[in-house]
Amino acid sequence: MSISPSRSILLVGEGNFSFSASASQLYSETETSLTATCLQHQEDALRHEGAADNIKIVKDSGGAVLFEVDCTKLGECASLQGRVFDRVVFNFPHCGRKSGVKKNRNLLKNFFLSCVQVLSEDGEVHVGLCNGQGGTPADHPQREWHNSWQVAAMAAEAHLILSDVRPFESEKYRSYKCTGYRSQDKGFHVEKGLLHVFTRSLPYTPAQVLKVEEAVEGDRVQYNIPAELSNYINRGFLCSGSVHPVRLVQDFLLKGLAEKWSVSMTTETIPFLLTTKQLQTCCDIDSTHCYWIHLLQKDLISDTNTSTDKEKDCLIFLDSQGRTDTQDSLSATRVTSDKVDRVRSKGAESLRSACSLDVDPEGESGLYMLRPSLLPQMEKLLTKKEQLINNAGSHGDNEGNNKSVEVEGHKKEGPHGGCNGVTSLLFGISGLVFKNVTVNLWALPAFHELLLRGVFPSECEPVKLLGQRLETLLTPYGVSLVAEQGGLRLMAQPMGCVGKVLASIASDKISNVSVTVSLNLDLLAVLLFSLPDWRLLWSHDPRFLQHFALHSSPGKPFHPFSLFPEHFSFDISFWTGPTWEEKKFHALIREASHGTVEQVKLIDTFSHPDLSQTSYCYRLIYHSNTHALSHTKALQFHKDLESFLTSRLQVTIR
């Protein structure tokens, strides 16, 4: 148990105060303050062998000793009123006598609920348990779950997460004599005991509907981003100086590619929204996976503005307090937010079903979608870039209108850089894209795409060369290349496809080949940093980024700040009307569960023979690597989902 200077420790459940005495001596030359407490009356406590001497050591070292302190009611203790501690320590808890595991679980749960009332915001709770009691994989051997004290699950009830498990250092506290086994002076077996360290979890925050204003194809548009996507907006993972793993992976890839080719990344802003006309330029995109959007408002941008002015019009990025934010250079948006309930009348229809493709795209409002890929906007940027180069001629540098950043590297001549002395350039953009997919373990509703495009002489076999370079960079992390018609697919287990390399004949010369590389930076970050879950990438917990500030090189595994989170399974059954849109169901799951549902399985369906109704039964698996998730909290989310389904989709819960 390491303690920093000027720290305060609260010890609860002491018996003979031998641990308190050892700790007092250990930290006697530091500014650590120690308060030792026990449940018993003073007279009863003094009956323990050595208790009087140990209490004297604690007091002589400047510590305090309190009696009749119930560790399950610390908030009610008059002597602790107004005090907070950096560490709360409970060594080898036990209900006394021949207690069963259920009673001891209940003791732990009530202790955790109590201790958070006197714990500082960044404080720790230390619980020492005998080997096997905790019920975590750190126990050797590990008991069956139902026969353990389920310490992590009990802590989650108090919104605490298990952040570390390490051996109990009994040799460090030489005078410590454990007591209390079956309410006697007998001790527990502490030699192979484990110290469980718990910290506070961030609270769950409610979903918001974000109101966005941006310029799209010459129009000023306003629309709502669906509530279940609100956590993915305005995060700035790719901004300059970011140590987020998504940015680290992008830098790693670009640096590796820049050893063979020149790479130019654009810094131009592009909107989240696409029109159907733009989507039609990219036949590789599945329209059923698009988030279709209804506009709240559309205005024609004044013709008096120049094209440059139009771009500048949409560079403002506002947070919910109206402050400017330019974290993500690809977010050409103005964003404000409100609580879901306050804008439900406007936001309920913002997510159009993928089956609504029969709406006339040439109608008054047209069809818009959140960008499922950066490809349509890359086409536009490349066209604009070509026009600027052609128009520049002898007028000099056009960098003011065509912003890009050269990736550090060297132009390579020869077989890799180009052919016949010609060096090819890879033009790239990266940013957030959206996929309206059902909830699944590796189905990402939003992720960062890195898109690269280059034109090469066909005799150089550019797909093969790019594939070989990507293979060199990514094979050590479990990525393999699979040939397919027109290119390559990058595959990895267990997530599947993490990228593609596609080739097409360049429009200018038949002898040239246009090659496009599309990479899912989020899934690659999971692979390169050994993350247990892609949802960790979106954690607001500062401990996540602190890890990468110290360990920025791919290949160094991430050490989770939440260990062994429990899975919870709940079923939900309901009757629907004649129409049922499953995508809306999954959208509500993400919103109601705060993203904690990782799998949804259809268990059963039944169509009523006389009524136009169908019954569905689904099984939902709740699990979180970012927050404390207790059985109570998961059940609350599940009840919220039932309420959402009843009020928004008009289903009847069975």
Regions inferred by a protein language model and the residue ranges of each:
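Conserved class I S-adenosyl-L-methionine
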Residues: 4-24, 31-35
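S-adenosyl-L-methionine
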Residues: 46-80
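Class II aminoacyl-tRNA synthetase-like tRNA-binding/catalytic domains
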Residues: 212-449, 453-455, 493-518, 526, ...
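A carboxyl-terminal module marker
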Residues: 476, 483-654
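A short glycine-rich, Lys/Arg-flanked "PGG" loop and its adjoining helix->strand segment in the class I
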Residues: 105-121
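Conserved beta-strand signature within the Rossmann-like core of class I S-adenosyl-L-methionine
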Residues: 121-129
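Class I S-adenosyl-L-methionine
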Residues: 133-211
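A short SAM/SAH-binding and catalytic strip from SAM-dependent methyltransferases
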Residues: 75, 83-105
